[in-house]
Swiss-Prot record:
It comes from the Eukaryota. GO terms for cellular component: Golgi apparatus; nucleus; plasmodesma; plastid. This is GTP-binding nuclear protein Ran-3. One of its GO terms (molecular function) is GTPase activity. One of its GO terms (biological process) is protein import into nucleus.
Protein backbone atom coordinates (compact mmCIF):
# COMPACT_ATOMS: atom_id res chain seq x y z
CA UNK A 1 0.00 0.00 0.00
CA UNK A 2 1.45 3.34 -1.03
CA UNK A 3 1.30 6.09 1.55
CA UNK A 4 1.48 9.83 0.81
CA UNK A 5 4.84 10.70 -0.74
CA UNK A 6 5.75 7.02 -0.74
CA UNK A 7 6.56 5.54 -4.09
CA UNK A 8 6.11 1.82 -4.66
CA UNK A 9 9.41 0.02 -4.13
CA UNK A 10 10.44 -3.57 -4.74
CA UNK A 11 11.64 -4.21 -1.19
CA UNK A 12 9.79 -4.17 2.16
CA UNK A 13 8.87 -0.70 3.39
CA UNK A 14 7.09 0.36 6.56
CA UNK A 15 5.52 3.52 7.94
CA UNK A 16 7.26 4.39 11.22
CA UNK A 17 5.64 7.08 13.37
CA UNK A 18 7.83 8.88 15.90
CA UNK A 19 6.04 10.58 18.78
CA UNK A 20 6.92 12.31 22.02
CA UNK A 21 7.00 15.77 23.55
CA UNK A 22 8.58 18.65 21.66
CA UNK A 23 12.29 19.04 22.28
CA UNK A 24 12.99 15.38 23.05
CA UNK A 25 15.23 15.02 19.99
CA UNK A 26 12.98 13.23 17.50
CA UNK A 27 14.04 15.36 14.53
CA UNK A 28 17.72 15.26 15.53
CA UNK A 29 17.49 11.47 15.76
CA UNK A 30 15.94 11.01 12.31
CA UNK A 31 18.35 13.47 10.70
CA UNK A 32 21.39 11.46 11.78
CA UNK A 33 20.65 9.14 8.83
CA UNK A 34 22.12 11.13 5.95
CA UNK A 35 20.35 9.38 3.06
CA UNK A 36 16.98 9.86 4.72
CA UNK A 37 17.75 13.52 5.35
CA UNK A 38 18.72 14.03 1.71
CA UNK A 39 15.55 12.38 0.36
CA UNK A 40 12.98 13.70 2.85
CA UNK A 41 9.64 15.03 1.60
CA UNK A 42 7.19 17.40 3.24
CA UNK A 43 3.53 16.34 3.50
CA UNK A 44 1.68 19.67 3.89
CA UNK A 45 -1.81 18.25 4.45
CA UNK A 46 -0.69 16.63 7.69
CA UNK A 47 2.28 18.85 8.50
CA UNK A 48 5.00 16.22 8.65
CA UNK A 49 8.34 15.48 7.09
CA UNK A 50 8.68 11.95 5.75
CA UNK A 51 12.24 10.62 5.81
CA UNK A 52 12.95 7.37 3.91
CA UNK A 53 15.56 5.53 5.99
CA UNK A 54 17.15 2.53 4.30
CA UNK A 55 18.87 -0.33 6.09
CA UNK A 56 20.62 -3.35 4.60
CA UNK A 57 19.98 -6.71 6.26
CA UNK A 58 21.05 -10.29 5.69
CA UNK A 59 17.63 -10.72 4.03
CA UNK A 60 17.97 -7.67 1.77
CA UNK A 61 17.18 -3.98 1.89
CA UNK A 62 14.33 -2.56 3.97
CA UNK A 63 13.01 0.98 4.23
CA UNK A 64 11.37 2.84 7.09
CA UNK A 65 9.32 5.85 6.07
CA UNK A 66 9.86 7.89 9.24
CA UNK A 67 7.11 10.40 9.89
CA UNK A 68 8.42 13.37 11.86
CA UNK A 69 5.87 15.73 13.39
CA UNK A 70 7.64 18.94 12.37
CA UNK A 71 7.01 20.29 15.87
CA UNK A 72 3.23 20.38 15.75
CA UNK A 73 2.95 18.38 18.99
CA UNK A 74 3.77 21.65 20.76
CA UNK A 75 0.31 22.90 19.79
CA UNK A 76 -1.58 19.98 21.32
CA UNK A 77 -2.18 16.43 20.17
CA UNK A 78 -1.45 15.09 16.72
CA UNK A 79 -4.14 14.46 14.13
CA UNK A 80 -5.22 10.89 13.49
CA UNK A 81 -3.88 11.27 9.95
CA UNK A 82 -0.40 11.17 11.41
CA UNK A 83 -0.99 7.73 12.92
CA UNK A 84 -3.21 6.09 10.28
CA UNK A 85 -1.53 3.14 8.54
CA UNK A 86 1.37 3.28 11.00
CA UNK A 87 3.08 -0.11 11.05
CA UNK A 88 5.57 0.53 13.85
CA UNK A 89 6.43 3.35 16.23
CA UNK A 90 9.05 4.99 18.42
CA UNK A 91 8.00 6.93 21.53
CA UNK A 92 10.77 9.27 22.61
CA UNK A 93 11.40 11.10 25.87
CA UNK A 94 14.30 13.16 27.18
CA UNK A 95 16.14 11.69 30.19
CA UNK A 96 17.03 15.25 31.27
CA UNK A 97 13.37 16.37 31.46
CA UNK A 98 11.03 14.44 33.78
CA UNK A 99 7.83 15.80 32.28
CA UNK A 100 8.64 14.26 28.90
CA UNK A 101 8.69 10.82 30.55
CA UNK A 102 5.52 11.48 32.53
CA UNK A 103 3.78 12.21 29.21
CA UNK A 104 4.82 8.89 27.65
CA UNK A 105 1.56 7.12 28.71
CA UNK A 106 -0.47 9.78 26.89
CA UNK A 107 1.53 9.32 23.69
CA UNK A 108 1.18 5.55 24.01
CA UNK A 109 -2.58 5.81 24.49
CA UNK A 110 -3.03 8.11 21.49
CA UNK A 111 -0.89 5.83 19.35
CA UNK A 112 -2.67 2.61 20.32
CA UNK A 113 -6.08 4.20 19.81
CA UNK A 114 -5.35 4.37 16.07
CA UNK A 115 -2.65 1.73 15.56
CA UNK A 116 -3.47 -1.56 17.26
CA UNK A 117 -0.90 -4.26 17.92
CA UNK A 118 2.09 -2.66 16.22
CA UNK A 119 5.66 -3.04 17.51
CA UNK A 120 6.68 -0.03 19.61
CA UNK A 121 10.08 1.02 20.95
CA UNK A 122 10.43 3.45 23.86
CA UNK A 123 13.60 5.55 23.61
CA UNK A 124 15.17 7.62 26.36
CA UNK A 125 17.27 10.20 24.53
CA UNK A 126 20.14 12.49 25.60
CA UNK A 127 21.97 9.97 27.81
CA UNK A 128 25.16 11.84 26.88
CA UNK A 129 24.08 14.63 29.28
CA UNK A 130 25.66 14.23 32.71
CA UNK A 131 22.83 15.36 35.01
CA UNK A 132 20.01 13.14 33.83
CA UNK A 133 16.71 13.59 35.67
CA UNK A 134 15.12 10.26 34.71
CA UNK A 135 17.25 7.39 36.00
CA UNK A 136 17.18 3.93 34.45
CA UNK A 137 15.46 2.47 37.54
CA UNK A 138 12.63 4.99 37.18
CA UNK A 139 11.79 3.93 33.63
CA UNK A 140 9.20 1.20 34.09
CA UNK A 141 6.45 2.04 31.59
CA UNK A 142 7.86 -0.28 28.92
CA UNK A 143 7.76 -3.23 31.31
CA UNK A 144 4.12 -2.57 32.14
CA UNK A 145 3.15 -2.36 28.48
CA UNK A 146 5.59 -4.95 27.11
CA UNK A 147 7.51 -2.48 24.96
CA UNK A 148 11.18 -2.58 24.00
CA UNK A 149 13.30 0.14 25.66
CA UNK A 150 16.60 1.61 24.55
CA UNK A 151 18.66 4.46 25.91
CA UNK A 152 20.07 6.52 23.07
CA UNK A 153 22.03 9.66 22.35
CA UNK A 154 21.05 11.12 19.00
CA UNK A 155 23.92 13.61 18.98
CA UNK A 156 26.55 10.92 19.54
CA UNK A 157 24.89 8.18 17.40
CA UNK A 158 24.91 5.95 20.51
CA UNK A 159 22.52 3.01 19.95
CA UNK A 160 21.13 4.67 16.79
CA UNK A 161 20.52 1.39 14.98
CA UNK A 162 18.99 -0.58 17.87
CA UNK A 163 15.38 0.69 17.60
CA UNK A 164 15.38 0.07 13.85
CA UNK A 165 16.85 -3.42 14.19
CA UNK A 166 14.28 -4.38 16.84
CA UNK A 167 11.40 -3.11 14.68
CA UNK A 168 12.79 -4.79 11.56
CA UNK A 169 12.98 -8.14 13.36
CA UNK A 170 9.43 -7.80 14.65
CA UNK A 171 8.02 -6.76 11.27
CA UNK A 172 9.89 -9.53 9.44
CA UNK A 173 9.09 -12.13 12.09
CA UNK A 174 12.75 -13.09 12.13
CA UNK A 175 14.70 -12.82 15.38
CA UNK A 176 17.95 -13.62 13.52
CA UNK A 177 17.69 -10.68 11.12
CA UNK A 178 20.71 -8.41 11.34
CA UNK A 179 22.16 -5.40 9.59
CA UNK A 180 25.04 -6.22 7.26
CA UNK A 181 26.29 -2.65 6.87
CA UNK A 182 25.92 0.54 8.82
CA UNK A 183 23.96 3.45 7.35
CA UNK A 184 25.76 6.69 6.61
CA UNK A 185 25.34 8.77 9.76
CA UNK A 186 26.20 12.38 10.47
CA UNK A 187 29.44 12.73 12.46
CA UNK A 188 28.83 12.65 16.22
CA UNK A 189 28.48 16.07 17.83
CA UNK A 190 29.32 14.69 21.27
CA UNK A 191 31.16 11.59 22.47
CA UNK A 192 30.16 8.96 25.02
CA UNK A 193 33.19 7.11 26.31
CA UNK A 194 33.23 3.37 26.79
CA UNK A 195 33.05 3.60 30.59
CA UNK A 196 29.87 5.69 30.38
CA UNK A 197 28.33 3.21 27.91
CA UNK A 198 29.13 0.32 30.24
CA UNK A 199 27.62 2.22 33.15
CA UNK A 200 24.39 2.85 31.19
CA UNK A 201 24.14 -0.84 30.35
CA UNK A 202 24.82 -1.94 33.94
CA UNK A 203 22.14 0.44 35.26
CA UNK A 204 19.63 -0.86 32.71
CA UNK A 205 20.38 -4.46 33.63
CA UNK A 206 19.97 -3.68 37.34
CA UNK A 207 16.71 -1.82 36.69
CA UNK A 208 15.28 -4.73 34.69
CA UNK A 209 15.73 -7.05 37.66
CA UNK A 210 13.82 -4.83 40.08
CA UNK A 211 10.15 -5.52 40.88
CA UNK A 212 7.66 -3.19 39.25
CA UNK A 213 6.04 -0.54 41.49
CA UNK A 214 2.46 -1.29 42.49
CA UNK A 215 1.03 2.05 41.45
CA UNK A 216 0.65 3.43 37.95
CA UNK A 217 2.69 6.55 38.62
CA UNK A 218 6.40 6.21 38.08
CA UNK A 219 8.03 7.80 41.09
CA UNK A 220 10.96 10.19 41.09
CA UNK A 221 13.02 10.27 44.24
Amino acid sequence: MALPNQQTVDYPSFKLVIVGDGGTGKTTFVKRHLTGEFEKKYEPTIGVEVHPLDFFTNCGKIRFYCWDTAGQEKFGGLRDGYYIHGQCAIIMFDVTARLTYKNVPTWHRDLCRVCENIPIVLCGNKVDVKNRQVKAKQVTFHRKKNLQYYEISAKSNYNFEKPFLYLARKLAGDANLHFVESPALAPPEVQIDLAAQQQHEAELAAAASQPLPDDDDDTFE
